[in-house]
């Protein structure tokens, strides 16, 4: 059985024909994507269903994305989508249709631990395409139904297999943008979303140095990110970078590049792929962004679903709202868990 989700898409721009398709289609479920999926299902001679989850997607993912940016955090909506939409709502629908497993096109591997029998989430063979970072939120229950057939292959190998089978999507371009944000313009999206739904728009506020001295004014926290240097609109003797987005004061804190480095930080909303945290500190590799290089360190579970990461060497731009994901296991490629950076 083939299933595709119809996700929320931004409404047409002012003046557009309301009866026409949205001018800013969701990249994951555009009319073209649905047509392609339907053609593949027909070629494979399997049933094909489109399941509408627009409203739960908007409430759970899009509102969260907006709220996080307005609060001065930098969210990764794919994490929440994978846990609550793809591997909850979609999994429920798949099981209701009589499916035994849910197979997706993520580049990641899953297998059983030979000692404990628990499901293990592991990096893909093609490390350049590995998507384990955005799947660290999955539970044992979700992993028990998950299949990731692409995890052992490279992207060129997958395209070659699709071409051999005559599938019409063999050469289709891939998208790495946030699916509901057109042209990756998240600043414009936050502004438009606030206007369309009558929500508070990002408000201007002060740009402060580390001593609290005001150096200038910002146009709204959503327009900045930790590590940013260009576009601050302030003159200084040395290059200044965004160090912190202070939601409580609606302030952008800036300072020298050296102040961006951190070797210790905490995370909250921590999840563990084996469902229970380790008994104590664990040697791990930590990734703080999707495309970041992993750094060796020690992670220690804390009360209230939190954890502390201590890295062997400091890294730059550890960004609140992004996930820190912990890797370990015998081969070092197992996803142990992760949490949102505080």
Predicted regions and their residues:
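ATP-dependent adenylation/nucleotidyltransferase module used to activate substrates
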Residues: 1-136, 147, 157-158, 242
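AMP-forming adenylation/ATP pyrophosphatase catalytic core
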Residues: 103-110, 114-342
């Amino acid at each position: 059985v083939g299933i595709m989700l119809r996700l929320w898409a931004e409404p047409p721009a002012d003046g557009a024909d309301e009866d026409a398709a949205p001018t800013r289609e969701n990249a994951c479920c555009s009319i073209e994507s649905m047509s392609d999926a339907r053609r593949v299902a027909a070629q494979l001679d399997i049933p094909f269903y489109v399941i509408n989850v627009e409203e739960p997607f908007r409430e759970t993912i899009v509102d969260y994305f907006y709220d996080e940016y307005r609060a001065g955090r930098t969210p990764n909506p794919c994490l929440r989508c994978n846990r609550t939409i793809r591997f909850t709502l979609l999994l429920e629908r798949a099981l209701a249709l009589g499916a035994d497993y849910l197979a997706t096109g993520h580049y990641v591997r899953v297998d059983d631990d030979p000692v404990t029998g628990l499901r293990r989430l592991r990096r893909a063979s093609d490390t350049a395409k590995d998507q384990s970072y955005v799947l660290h939120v999955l539970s044992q229950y979700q992993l028990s139904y998950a299949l990731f057939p692409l995890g052992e292959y490279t992207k060129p190998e997958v395209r070659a297999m699709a071409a051999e089978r005559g599938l019409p999507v063999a050469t289709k371009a891939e998208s790495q943008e946030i699916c509901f944000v057109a042209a990756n313009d998240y600043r414009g999206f936050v502004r438009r979303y606030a206007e369309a739904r009558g929500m508070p728009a990002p408000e201007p506020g002060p740009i402060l140095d580390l001593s609290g001295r005001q150096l200038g004014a910002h146009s709204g926290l959503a327009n900045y990110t930790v590590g940013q240097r260009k576009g601050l609109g302030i003159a200084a003797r040395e290059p200044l970078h965004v160090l912190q987005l202070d939601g409580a004061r609606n302030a952008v804190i800036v300072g020298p590049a050296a102040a961006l480095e951190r070797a210790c930080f905490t995370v909250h909303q921590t999840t563990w792929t084996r469902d229970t945290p380790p008994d104590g500190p664990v040697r791990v590799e930590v990734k703080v962004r999707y495309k970041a290089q992993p750094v060796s360190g020690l992670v220690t579970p804390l009360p209230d679903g939190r954890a502390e990461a201590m890295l062997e060497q400091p890294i730059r731009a550890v960004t609140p709202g992004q996930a820190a994901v912990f890797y370990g296991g015998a081969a070092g490629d197992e996803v142990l868990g992760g949490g949102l950076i505080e």
